[in-house]
């Protein structure tokens, strides 16, 4: 399960757009993923991370969360082959002299090989257990809940991390299962004002309607 950012991965060639999962594309500040039917608009003055920076952040984050737990680190690394980082954007440039740099991430992880994961709640159940097992002391201020975004049900998990006695970072994980992938948004903030800015990005999202599931006679 994804605890930090996923790895950037490219799509296949020789297929029509939308037939196979890929990392999507940016058109200015608009992100599109035809396979998932996902479109969203990012603030023009926010800072999109390049694939190399994302991958470096992934490796660092995995080591911090896993600590000395080699089994957890190995599991995270194994999941990278099935994970695509679609969007990673910060409000300020990396290294800016600010108290906290709000971050918006969108990740897709293949789960078609895991028949027990049918909903975002199933996915986040395992993600929460992994967070609880990490060396970092996450707390969960409320139970997981369901929220409808762009006409689609997402399960939401809120996790908090006290970096200092007076500094609390909140991560909101919003997940749904779509065409064999968990579509996961991660909003990271330290104030309600920052949360509102991240939620405003999320509210630009549209998701194309999926064809009805096939029924067996």
Q: What is the role of each PLM region?
A:
Residues 1-8:
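Bacterial N-terminal signal peptides
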Residues 8-100, 112, 132-153, 163-169, ...:
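N-terminal targeting sequences that direct proteins away from the cytosol to non-cytosolic compartments
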Residues 41, 106, 122, 126, ...:
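Extracytoplasmic/secreted proteins, especially bacterial periplasmic and envelope-associated proteins
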Residues 108-122, 127-140:
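Mid-length scaffold segments of soluble, non-membrane domains
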Residues 157:
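Nucleotide and nucleotide-moiety/phosphate-recognizing core
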Residues 172-174:
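Extracellular C-type lectin-like domains
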């Amino acid at each position: 399960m994804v605890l930090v950012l996923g790895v950037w991965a490219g799509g296949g060639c020789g297929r029509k757009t939308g037939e196979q999962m890929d990392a999507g594309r940016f058109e200015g500040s608009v992100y599109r993923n035809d396979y998932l039917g996902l479109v969203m608009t990012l603030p023009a003055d926010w800072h999109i991370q390049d694939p190399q920076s994302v991958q470096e952040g992934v490796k660092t984050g995995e080591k911090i969360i896993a600590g000395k737990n080699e089994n957890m680190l190995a599991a995270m690394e194994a999941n990278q082959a099935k994970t695509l980082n679609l969007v990673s954007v910060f409000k300020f440039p990396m290294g800016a002299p600010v108290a906290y740099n709000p971050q918006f991430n969108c990740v897709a992880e293949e789960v078609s090989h895991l028949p027990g994961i049918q909903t975002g709640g199933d996915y986040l159940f395992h993600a929460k257990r992994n967070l609880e097992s990490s060396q970092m002391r996450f707390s969960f201020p409320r139970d997981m809940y369901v929220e409808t975004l762009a006409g689609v049900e997402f399960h939401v998990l809120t996790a908090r991390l006290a970096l200092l006695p007076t500094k609390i970072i909140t991560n909101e994980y919003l997940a749904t299962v779509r065409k064999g992938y968990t579509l996961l948004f991660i909003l990271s903030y330290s104030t309600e004002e920052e949360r509102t800015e991240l939620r405003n990005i999320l509210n630009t999202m549209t998701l194309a309607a999926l064809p009805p599931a096939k029924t067996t006679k």
